[in-house]
Amino acid sequence: MKHISFLLITLLGGVSVATAASVVAPGAKVEKLAGGMKFTEGPVWLPQQNKVVFSDIPNSKLMQWSEKNGLSEFRKSEQANGNILDLQGRIISCQHAARNIIRIEKDGRAKVLADKFDGKRFNSPNDVAVRHDGTLWFTDPPWGLRGPHEIPGHWVYKLDPATGKVEVLIKDLAMPNGIVFSPDGSRLYVADTGGNKRHPDPAFHKFSASITCYAVTKAGKLGKQLFKIKEGSDGMAVDVKGNLYTTHRNVQVYSTDGKKLQTIEVPEGPANVCFGGKDYKTLFITARTSLYQVRLVHAGAVSLRGKQ
């Protein structure tokens, strides 16, 4: 593999440097779009409205930003975290306080898709990915849990919205967090932020942070582990080339074989990313109190373009 230099983006003085092999567009820099929130997460691009919607978790709000109208409140939430569009263009949202997965219908109603497994309430659903068959794959660590665990672990699930069926996919992660499919759906990336004493099983307390790449069969079954990246992440996204964009201190970019390609420096610690803009070459970054963007070379791999 040929050498790919790291990217350094310096906001002071508006200077940006990108190498010829950079995933960042020539001359592009990380730009702050909005600030003043408490903790931002879960950005999702709404193509028909040309705006990005994202969570402000502690304030229990979904916010929205567009180039035309700037920043405003989109709607109240129950401490929503990760968001994504389903194949019909509806927002799917993971809610900490309500411990559920909801779908925001076209008329604005929020429909609960799932809040339990085997009669026990989820911990606090964190992030969600949609497969091309419409199923929702989501992580359930306890970051928003305010009481005791009902489920004896921090698991990854698959939800069929058509039937309401929920099945467990992964039980052997300490704190599953970000989750995303490869462009063709043949791989699933799941981030684990590592062990701490919130896990009900002490065996998980010393787990290291990581990102695991799993095979996914054509029938939608989880396959074997393909490789593991020895760094964790919060939310993640992939571009059309299959490059993985993670949020560990800054935005880290990995190749399809798990090799680190670049670091995109962000003034605040990022929590999640999504692709958007009319050509899907804008990376929106939620980072602590703010929303940022940077223009990229490759478009994002998203399940929905223009339908909403």
What name fits each language-model region?
Residues 5-16:
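Bacterial N-terminal signal peptides
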Residues 19-308:
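Sequence-structural signature of mature extracellular/luminal beta-sheet repeat domains
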